[in-house]
Amino acid sequence: ENINYCAEKGIKVLGTSEHAPSMPGAPHYWYFGNLKVVPRVINGVTILKGCEANILDIEGSLDMSDEASKNLDYMIASFHEPVFKPRSREENTLAILNVMDKYDKVEILGHLGNPNYQLNYEAIIKKAKEKDIMIEINNSSLLGSSRIGSDVNCKKVALLCKEIGTKVILTSDAHINTCIGVFNKGIELLKEIQMPEELVMNDPEKLIAHLKSKGRLSDL
């Protein structure tokens, strides 16, 4: 359904990133292992096989082992309230910093603007640049349909990415096919702050080159 929608709309690359198993209602680990049988290109759409992994503790553990994630092209690391209850600013920040040190497959930090999690954005964004990790600009957060109150923080995050020179990626956080590729609020924000184009990783060739530089996508 998602692939056919992308083909109809002329979307060339689809990143699929289902929630990892600790999230209520998420698929079993075997779902992610089975992604190895999904062709790289279907109906002219290149498939990037990912996962939105849950941060479990301040040590930076994720609910995706090396074995479970070995067939993935990338992981998004995110906080979700049912899995990691918000803690102090220092503890929340430490958890994300530790994730970046522990998991090579983490390519994106998800919805940092969530106001329920106080964070030292500067420390996180500086380390993300050092590790060549992208910061998500989440359209759903900016719309206010999820993580209400994120918009102000999202702007702070985007401005720091611009200042520090950290890569960003616009995401739709689509939970239905008709929302795939909907970045309107994210685009508005990046235009408003005059984000340099070279930091925005949504161009298919640029994104694929980024992943290839990390040793991914050997079949492309």
Where are these regions (language model features)?
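Histidine/acidic-residue-rich catalytic or RNA/ligand-binding cores of hydrolases
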Residues: 1, 25-29, 118-126, 145-160, ...
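Active-site metal-binding motif and surrounding structural segment of the metallo-beta-lactamase
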Residues: 4-13
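Extended substrate/RNA-proximal surfaces in nucleic-acid metabolism proteins
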Residues: 7, 20, 24-137, 191-200, ...
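Ser/Thr-glycine-rich phosphate-binding loops at phosphate-binding pockets of nucleotides
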Residues: 13-19
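Short gly/pro/ser/thr-enriched loop/turn and capping motifs at secondary-structure boundaries
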Residues: 21-22, 83-84, 142-144, 176-178
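His/Asp/Glu-enriched short active-site or ligand-binding loop at hydrolase and phosphoryl-transfer sites
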Residues: 134-146
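Short acidic/histidine-rich active-site segments
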Residues: 166-180
